[in-house]
Amino acid sequence: MTVKLVLASKSPFRSALLKNAGIEFSTASADIDERAVEAPLYESGATPEDVAQILAEAKAIDVSEKNPGAVVIGCDQTLSLGDEIFHKPHDMEAARRQLQKFSGKTHQLNSAVVLARDGKTLWRHVSIAHMTMRDLDAGFIGRYLGRVGDIALSSVGAYQVEGPGIQLFEKIDGDYFTIVGLPLLPLLAELRREKCIDG
């Protein structure tokens, strides 16, 4: 294929998913202030799904404007518990508080992926996963965070289901790729439709 693909993310997890799928691509970081973009969206009543899609689109558009002719993949993930929105914890105490809030409850992961070329959106998709944590006591949360260390700070939920974080859960409703932040099957289907990959 002659179409250049660019992943608008420096996430090693998203890169690994695409590499494992046999996709050739480069990476570039978007130059956007995510918190500045999302604050007015939430104030105007946007849903967490909307916010994930708008942020993914902003990243894809930004990088596509700097990479003429390339098809750019933008991604974003939001986490909500009821009306409360969560971001990556900034330190271990914030991670501990998040896990205490999630304990025994079901939160929602909203993973958006957008394709853009030359500053124009080609395609958008949002997938949702419902994540039910088991009841966690403070001792277990402390031991879990001690075991995983700073990796807890690299994920919006302070966990990664591909590692010890899976032990936090009682039930998961949703696609694995949605949970790890890149709805891969819909993305691959669209890349085939756009003739970006063989198919």
Swiss-Prot record:
Main enzyme class: hydrolase
Keyword Nucleotide-binding: no
EC number(s) recorded for this UniProt protein: 3.6.1.-
One annotated GO biological process: nucleotide metabolic process
Localization per record: Cytoplasm
GO cellular component, one term: cytoplasm
Residues annotated as catalytic: 76 (proton acceptor)
Catalytic activity field: N(7)-methyl-GTP + H2O = N(7)-methyl-GMP + diphosphate + H(+)
Cofactor entry: a divalent metal cation
Keywords: Cytoplasm, Hydrolase, Nucleotide metabolism
GO molecular function ontology, one term from the record: nucleoside triphosphate diphosphatase activity
Site (Important for substrate specificity): 13, 77, 162
Function: Nucleoside triphosphate pyrophosphatase that hydrolyzes 7-methyl-GTP (m(7)GTP). May have a dual role in cell division arrest and in preventing the incorporation of modified nucleotides into cellular nucleic acids.
Similarity annotation: Belongs to the Maf family. YceF subfamily.
Protein name per its UniProtKB record: 7-methyl-GTP pyrophosphatase
Originating species: Brucella suis biovar 1 (strain 1330)
Gene name of the record: maf-2
